[in-house]
């Protein structure tokens, strides 16, 4: 009952958008999860797929796990730091632009 993790920190993605994709694959077998992510047309799907592939590679290389039996045990997306930017407006004013980041955590196991 081994578990292997992969983490991606500081991704330029909003937490809510990342969680929508994470909810799609939680608890599924990894081949089914990769299939879902391949055909999900969201930016977050590409990011989560890379982290999931990394977790699968870690499980195979470090733990010698059989890929066919792996499942997505846990996947969660947490809020990271928010990058604060500035854009010029009329009459010498300025507005703040928030560019949110998040951290993606994936654990696979059998």
UniProtKB/Swiss-Prot annotation:
Alphabetical list of Pfam families matching this protein: Ribosomal_L22 (PF00237)
UniProt xrefs under PROSITE patterns: RIBOSOMAL_L22 (PS00464)
Gene3D superfamilies: Ribosomal protein L22/L17 (3.90.470.10)
UniProt keyword Ribosomal protein present: yes
HAMAP family: Ribosomal_uL22_B
PANTHER family, per database record: CHLOROPLAST 50S RIBOSOMAL PROTEIN L22-RELATED, LARGE RIBOSOMAL SUBUNIT PROTEIN UL22M
Domain of life: Bacteria
Keywords carried by this UniProt record: Ribonucleoprotein, Ribosomal protein, RNA-binding, rRNA-binding
rRNA-binding recorded as keyword: yes
A GO BP annotation: translation
Classification via CDD domains: Ribosomal_L22
Family recorded in the similarity comment: Belongs to the universal ribosomal protein uL22 family.
GO CC terms of this entry: cytosolic large ribosomal subunit
Protein name in UniProt: Large ribosomal subunit protein uL22
Organism: Paracidovorax citrulli (strain AAC00-1)
Role this protein plays: This protein binds specifically to 23S rRNA; its binding is stimulated by other ribosomal proteins, e.g. L4, L17, and L20. It is important during the early stages of 50S assembly. It makes multiple contacts with different domains of the 23S rRNA in the assembled 50S subunit and ribosome.
The protein's assembly and partners: Part of the 50S ribosomal subunit.
NCBIfam families for this protein: rplV_bact (TIGR01044)
GO molecular function: rRNA binding; structural constituent of ribosome
């Amino acid at each position: 009952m081994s578990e292997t993790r992969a983490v991606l920190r500081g991704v330029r993605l909003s937490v809510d958008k990342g969680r929508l994709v994470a909810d799609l694959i939680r608890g599924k077998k990894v081949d089914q999860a990769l299939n879902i992510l391949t055909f999900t047309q969201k930016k977050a799907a590409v990011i989560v797929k890379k982290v999931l592939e990394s977790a699968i590679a870690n499980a195979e290389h470090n733990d010698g796990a059989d890929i066919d039996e792996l499942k997505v045990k846990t996947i969660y997306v947490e809020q990271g730091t928010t990058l604060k930017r500035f854009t010029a407006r009329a009459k010498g004013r300025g507005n703040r632009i928030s560019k949110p980041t998040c951290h993606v955590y994936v654990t696979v196991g059998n």
